[in-house]
Every structure is written in structure tokens, then in C-alpha cells.
Amino acid sequence: MSDLDIQIPTAFDPFAEANAGDSGAAAGSKDYVHVRIQQRNGRKSLTTVQGLKKEFSYSKILKDLKKEFCCNGTVVQDPELGQVIQLQGDQRKNVSNFLVQAGIVKKEHIKIHGF
């Protein structure tokens, strides 16, 4: 009776496999431009654009986006994500169309997140 297999329960991490191959996946994930929406207070929202190539002038892109969509925005330096463009309002579809028409990013390299 002493030959019982007893398994001790341990903490299960569902993302362990995804994080294990992080070194190779990080280079591939940089190819995408992520357009997200963040809820602020009430009906207010914030659109963020992340993952643009570093050789682009973020301030010039922001200036064109603000002029095109009649909204305010800023470029934020994030320690983890790098430079991120923030725009007021839900501008996800507008931003993705603008980036494709301007030739900055191909349509298949844009990922839209939110709601």
C-alpha cells in the first residue's frame, strides 16, 4: 500500500509556454502596429498606437493625425513599450485607414484591439 502515487498540487501558470520562447517571439511581434482603445471616465476614451518603426517621426505623424481627425493627442515615452501615440476619442478605424493610405504600415500588419 505504500506505492501510492501522490501528486502535490502546484501553482499552474497558463502562460509558461508562451513566456519560455519569448526571445524568438519578441522579434516577430515587433512587426505589428497595435491600435488600442482605453476607457477613461464616463464616455471618454483614449486611442493608443504602438509599434511603429523607430525611424518614423512620431511628432509629424501625430500632427497629421490630429489635423485629420480634429482631436487632441500626444506622444508618450513608455519604458516597456517605447514611444506610444495617444489620441482622444475612439479613432481606431480612422488611424488604421490613415496608416495604410499614408503607406506607413501594410493592412495585414495592423492589429486593432478593444471592445
From Swiss-Prot:
Keyword list, A-Z: Protein biosynthesis, Translation regulation
Keyword Protein biosynthesis annotated: yes
InterPro entries: SUI1, SUI1_dom_sf, SUI1_euk
Keyword Repeat: no
CDD domains assigned to the protein according to its UniProt record, in alphabetical order: eIF1_SUI1
Gene Ontology terms, MF aspect: RNA binding; translation initiation factor activity
Any Gene Ontology biological process: regulation of translation
Source taxon at top rank: Eukaryota
Function in brief: Probably involved in translation.
Sequence similarity: Belongs to the SUI1 family.
Descriptive protein name: Protein translation factor SUI1 homolog
Organism: Zea mays
Taxonomic classification: Eukaryota, Viridiplantae, Streptophyta, Embryophyta, Tracheophyta
